[in-house]
């Protein structure tokens, strides 16, 4: 029997509907709406497309949205000055700088320049520290890990006491989702193992998992024989493996051999249509949370 598909597209619709209702309520109560500035440096097609989607989503929810499109020759000092401007702008509740940046700009300097209380990507060291502490100290959750946790909760996956194996140790996905799953709370309380390129016998670790979260960036890395029967498999990978000759669009594959693994797993996310749609939804949720914190 094939696994149940966890659709990030459908869950995203639910979340955006809830956010839109909350924005209407906020406007009625406080006379303001969430404000988000998106800052893009250069003309990378992938970054331009992603920023465009973020802007479109924000506007559809009734946010106040400001777009700053800067030349690839913009200096680090100029970018820092622009961030400072929006840090001090009370109409802006979220400051988002699209990564990656041109090589002459130090990304960490830019991330740390953003006001932690407007850091809706949750990349600032202060927000990473708050995540480590947990509880009421957490203002924002990193967007992709938050999307994963939301998918687990809304699809009825029991996490308390579960064996969770995270494949990948990036600062954006692997480390934060492992930390979040180990915390006390809803969608957490799990026993977590992180595995990576330096781990021995990857398959053995994966076979222990009640919940397997794969963020390795290697297409079709995880095979069906790595899966515990009935496990929940969350595939974070988005790998371009070619181009469709008829449509000209990229062919995407996850880190999991989806067709084979779905015959073993109990629940599984597809690529595309799984974790991907959740990331922007959680960015909007963070921006709303920031706006409410600044307004109340």
Swiss-Prot record:
Its EC number is 1.5.1.5, 3.5.4.9. GO terms for biological process: L-histidine biosynthetic process; methionine biosynthetic process; purine nucleotide biosynthetic process; tetrahydrofolate interconversion. GO terms for cellular component: cytosol. The keyword NADP applies. Pathway: One-carbon metabolism; tetrahydrofolate interconversion. NADP(+) binds at residues 168-170, 197, 238. Pfam families: THF_DHG_CYH, THF_DHG_CYH_C. The keyword Secreted does not apply. CDD domains: NAD_bind_m-THF_DH_Cyclohyd. Gene3D superfamilies: Leucine Dehydrogenase, chain A, domain 1, NAD(P)-binding Rossmann-like Domain. Disulfide bonds: none annotated. SUPFAM superfamilies: Aminoacid dehydrogenase-like, N-terminal domain, NAD(P)-binding Rossmann-fold domains. It catalyses: (6R)-5,10-methylene-5,6,7,8-tetrahydrofolate + NADP(+) = (6R)-5,10-methenyltetrahydrofolate + NADPH; (6R)-5,10-methenyltetrahydrofolate + H2O = (6R)-10-formyltetrahydrofolate + H(+). Keywords: Amino-acid biosynthesis, Histidine biosynthesis, Hydrolase, Methionine biosynthesis, Multifunctional enzyme, NADP, One-carbon metabolism, Oxidoreductase, Purine biosynthesis. InterPro entries: Aminoacid_DH-like_N_sf, NAD(P)-bd_dom_sf, THF_DH/CycHdrlase, THF_DH/CycHdrlase_cat_dom, THF_DH/CycHdrlase_CS, THF_DH/CycHdrlase_NAD-bd_dom. GO terms for molecular function: methenyltetrahydrofolate cyclohydrolase activity; methylenetetrahydrofolate dehydrogenase (NADP+) activity. Catalyzes the oxidation of 5,10-methylenetetrahydrofolate to 5,10-methenyltetrahydrofolate and then the hydrolysis of 5,10-methenyltetrahydrofolate to 10-formyltetrahydrofolate. Homodimer. Belongs to the tetrahydrofolate dehydrogenase/cyclohydrolase family. This is Bifunctional protein FolD. The gene is folD.
